[in-house]
Amino acid sequence: MRVRKPAVAGYFYESGREELLQQIEWAVKHELGPKALQMPKLGGEALGGVAPHAGYMYSGPVAAWLYSALAGYGKPDVFVIVGPNHYGIGAPVAIMKSGAWETPLGRVEVDRELAEVITSHFKEVEDDFYAFSKEHSVEVQVPFIQYYFGDVKIVPIVMWRQTLSTSRELGRAIAKALKEYGRKAYVIASSDFNHYEPHDITTRKDEMAISKILKLDEAGLFEISSKFDISICGIGPIGVLIAAAKELGYINVTLLKHATSGDTSGYKDETVGYASILFYR
């Protein structure tokens, strides 16, 4: 069995099991966190949402909001996690179709069945284990999933080809696959928002981008990000989630929490934006 070993344990999050459990608990209880492990449902069913992927000491409290919200909708069979490929390693759109991912909290198995169905609907996605070797955008979601939901499967996908058309095609393919799969699944778009600008500028730019997401306007998101130089590293995965949501009828989108690294670190001269956003119907 192919096992993807942790690449950023001890860097983005604690490398010891007990320390990591304590770190996630800290994120939940943080003044910027949700305070509770389960939030009341906002609607009948949830598709998933957007979550940040920075170091837990910076973005963990914001990420916890999405997982606490999803916990209110119940445990799924699988998480489809779509993240950016920061390093440009491997295929333009890469999926891991079999094997497992390891974290300090144990192993999670890749859902081969769902991965195969997604691939059948989008021929450009390639089974490429190497593409995930250094990438943290999927990895940092996995301990949160393990903490909140225990033993569930995942389908990891990363993309360095983050065009609007690729995002739409992959999103529609995931939607079709979930219809065929027939079991409970959540889709996570792993993304941070604006990068390395003062807190006030990052906040303003993020709010412009988030307004497009709340309207399910993926084209508008790409347009405004280009026009105002909003450096969203996972704009493609967010586009994937929006396209899937529209295809499946998840037309309600709620911003759960928005903050910057300045809010958690206190250093506001050069910040990164984070948001947890829930998609439901």
From Swiss-Prot:
Stored PANTHER family: PROTEIN MEMO1 (PTHR11060:SF0)
Disulphide linkage map: none
Organism whose genome encodes this protein: Pyrobaculum aerophilum (strain ATCC 51768 / DSM 7523 / JCM 9630 / CIP 104966 / NBRC 100827 / IM2)
InterPro entries for this protein: MEMO1_fam
Pfam families: Memo
Family, per entry: Belongs to the MEMO1 family.
UniProt-listed Gene3D superfamilies: LigB-like (3.40.830.10)
Protein's name in the database: MEMO1 family protein PAE0818
